[in-house]
């Protein structure tokens, strides 16, 4: 079985990708920047695709409305494109180091007419060091815990059930005991719906989820336990009940009208959902409002960063502006995007985020462990190539399930597979997420795609807190797995060295340690020949010469004879 939650939508269809490529080739677009995230001391090379309807003659680098550098086109190359059955021009531009941190713009001209503008953040910002050691616990607030109690189940899962910040606070001991050091909370702002992704007020907490004092206390108590709090932030769209949108809707002459994208009486939305109008993030006032809101929760409450919802929605220039402004003031904060895209397109967000939720990795993990789509050789090769493609600077964040997908166990029907997939997830450099309840063995009652509908609420059921509803052995397994990862830097920042065999096998290595990862997903024993002496990080057993792996089993082996 190959299972697809359709998170990628049309991106998995070749016809869609070809059509998108055709549209892209009709406009000027930035194909590549080298280096990908330029520093002040770097010479920078830009590669643009230029269609036939344009002829780029010159350009400028601009900062704060001041011309910093002018250039003529240094290199032109003709390119044939089968997808449009026509030529286009590849333009390469090299500029000297810009020397100063700043938010720059590159302008391209045809004679005296500006025909293209792209923002570029030149800076020394990086993901904070604490992020590479992060193990993220993803909490869907409305379903997690209500004060010190369990959230009561309701047949109407589309209504707010009342999970709140006090509920998270009441479970901090549990989260700390798991070994978690970062919590990502779904949107807590005043909202029309139970999921919080349609915000009525970016500066207020929804009363059903708590108060600002509750948030301050949660951040303080969590930080005292070595746990950071990351919030879910939604810049692409807001609730139609937001007073800003209501004023724009009712008054065609309002300055707020330009904060949105009106077309006559209609307006652009989030995937056609009329209750979620899209924000025009090319409008300076709208941009400033969103940035100020994001800064507010960091400055006033000590938030450690944001998961940015629907990051492919806003124009990519917005992210250059947002990232530069936030990191300039709060360099130790962490920002990762919900970038549901191909790896090639995702990489264009380097320098605009610290990292991304890795949807490609999510898909191939589920396709392999549940769907048995790939051979072990193909799977290990894909992981190796993705590691090399992204490198370690742009942080990938891994997950086996989330609030928009079916639970892993709902699809796999096998806790052994969940354990094996989790061991793999915790053995690669991507920052791992545990979705609340995953560690307890939570599943669901109905498929989110039942009847060709999208029933996300069935992956968002209330979390069970009574002992008889939790798998204590599975919780203990996750606790041990978290401890192992945190104790061995090779697992979260080591070099990935593939070994092609009849099972998943690879080495994670730093100068200080080498760990051999072996995962057998077959229903038969496998033998692996060892080239040294190893200690199993789960059992403590010592192995030399060879190791017999039982069916559906895994070993994390620390080499001890160096």
From Swiss-Prot:
GO-annotated biological processes: carbohydrate metabolic process
Annotated residues that bind Ca(2+) are located at: 236
Asked whether the keyword Cytoplasm is assigned, the reply is yes
Q: Where is the active site?
A: 309, 338
One GO term of the cellular component aspect? cytoplasm
- Which keywords belong to this entry? Calcium, Carbohydrate metabolism, Cytoplasm, Glycosidase, Hydrolase, Metal-binding
Q: Which reaction does it catalyse?
A: Endohydrolysis of (1->4)-alpha-D-glucosidic linkages in polysaccharides containing three or more (1->4)-alpha-linked D-glucose units
Give any GO molecular function from the UniProt entry.
metal ion binding
- Primary location recorded for the protein, binned into one broad class: cytoplasm
The annotated site for Transition state stabilizer falls at 404
Keyword Transport included in the entry's annotation: no
Q: How is the cofactor bound?
A: Binds 1 Ca(2+) ion per subunit.
Q: Write the Enzyme Commission number(s) for this entry.
A: 3.2.1.1
| Compartments, record wording | Cytoplasm
Q: Which cofactor does it need?
A: Ca(2+)
The record describes its quaternary structure and partners as: Monomer.
Additional information? When compared to AmyA, AmyB produced larger amounts of reducing sugar.
**UniProt family annotation:** Belongs to the glycosyl hydrolase 13 family.
Q: What is this protein called?
A: Alpha-amylase 2
Q: Which organism is it from?
A: Dictyoglomus thermophilum (strain ATCC 35947 / DSM 3960 / H-6-12)
